[in-house]
Regions:
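Active-site-proximal cap/loop segments of hydrolase catalytic domains
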Residues: 1-193
């Protein structure tokens, strides 16, 4: 936050139209920050973890390695297992603070992600939508943690531009972001509610 505040202090920065975007651990940071500040006009979260309590018991799909070490020892550095540090897992799981979210967010999470459980992006999206928050979820079938298909990468780039142009520059809401737009699963249009 110190860096964002330092940037906002510059005359050439419109501090009411700043955004945040991140992928993987950066996606987690976006998921966390939108629940703890309204400093950003919009956020983009790629492959985020939003609920460490549900992700803790998972595995890395590609290797079968437990995800527990990640929360105890590496990126999260909680230093305790889920049961002896339950309060720390809740505190570091932004989903429990989503009633406070004011920042619109575009989430991207793919169904072949072997690093971060795909259901984390779904949990984030469903929680925010259930709470009436502005949230969108993009999922690219058979794509992993990072996009490798050029067509999909271009699509994501275009949608990120649409999203940020709307919230940062006042561009019209793109059709794909409108509430009555169906989502597509395997070529079939569906509705969320």
């Amino acid at each position: 936050m110190a860096g964002a505040k330092a940037l906002a202090a510059n005359k050439w920065v419109d501090s009411s139209h700043m955004a945040i975007q991140g992928q993987s651990w950066g996606g987690y940071q976006v998921a966390y920050l939108i629940a703890h500040t309204d400093m950003f006009a919009a956020g983009g979260a790629g492959a985020p973890v939003c609920n460490m309590t549900s992700a803790y018991g998972g595995i890395r799909w590609g290797t079968g390695i437990s995800r527990q070490f990640q929360y105890e020892q590496t990126q999260s550095r909680i230093g305790k297992d889920l049961w002896s540090g339950f309060d720390l897992y809740i505190e570091n799981s932004p989903i429990f603070d989503y009633p406070k979210v004011k920042t619109p967010v575009l989430i991207m999470h793919n169904n072949a992600d072997g690093a971060v459980p795909y259901y984390q992006g779904i949990e984030m999206f469903m929680a925010l939508r259930r709470l009436g928050k502005p949230a969108w979820l993009l999922e690219y079938n058979r794509e992993a943690h990072n996009l490798s298909n050029r067509k999909n990468a271009k699509d994501l780039s275009k949608r990120l531009s649409d999203f940020f142009d709307h919230y940062l520059k006042g561009a019209p809401l793109p059709d794909w972001m409108k509430p009555d737009t169906p989502y597509i699963i395997n070529g079939q249009a569906k509705r969320l509610y």
